[in-house]
Amino acid sequence: MHVLVINGPNLNRLGKRQPEVYGSTTLADVEAMVARRADALGVGVSFIQSNHEGELIDAVHNAADHGWPVIINPGGFTHTSVALRDALAEIADGAGFVEVHISNVHAREPFRAHSYLSPIALGVIAGLGVRGYELALEFLADRER
């Protein structure tokens, strides 16, 4: 099994941008944590982060072509991107995806409570900090067994 972990806009700024909301853990820290957990689970994992919608869509298409499940933190595209949802629909029809948010998006500004992706996701993890990525990985690994 192989899982693609996708991080959307501004997540390259983890540890620097709004640490009171997102904490001090960097994206490199998150990727290392997930890679360690994936290794322990016997799961292959790869990562992409982009601030550009088209690059994320291309990554989703690549995952679909390989039959990989996806863990995605779409950042601000959660609330705005029909195109990303359309790409993820192919994953939803196949291996499936889990939507992850570091902060509790439902406890923040009202516009953050709406997700174009949640209705087609296997599940949504929000507000559990960076641990949400590991929980998503564990869920996907358990699902394969």
From Swiss-Prot:
EC main group: lyase
EC number per UniProt: 4.2.1.10
A Pfam cross-reference name: DHquinase_II
The keyword Lyase appears for this protein: yes
Protein's name in the database: 3-dehydroquinate dehydratase 2
Designated gene of the protein: aroQ2
Primary role: Catalyzes a trans-dehydration via an enolate intermediate.
InterPro entries listed in its UniProt record: DHquinase_II, DHquinase_II_CS, DHquinase_II_sf
Metabolic or biological pathway, per its Swiss-Prot or TrEMBL entry: Metabolic intermediate biosynthesis; chorismate biosynthesis; chorismate from D-erythrose 4-phosphate and phosphoenolpyruvate: step 3/7
CDD domains: DHQase_II
Organism: Corynebacterium efficiens (strain DSM 44549 / YS-314 / AJ 12310 / JCM 11189 / NBRC 100395)
One of the GO biological process terms: quinate catabolic process
Gene Ontology terms, MF aspect: 3-dehydroquinate dehydratase activity
Summary of subunit composition and partner proteins: Homododecamer.
Protein family: Belongs to the type-II 3-dehydroquinase family.
Keywords: Amino-acid biosynthesis, Aromatic amino acid biosynthesis, Lyase
UniProt catalytic activity: 3-dehydroquinate = 3-dehydroshikimate + H2O
Transition state stabilizer (site feature) positions: 17
Keyword Lyase: yes
Domain of life: Bacteria
Transmembrane segments: none
Annotated substrate binding sites: 73, 79, 86, 102-103, 112
Record: active site: 22 (proton acceptor), 101 (proton donor)
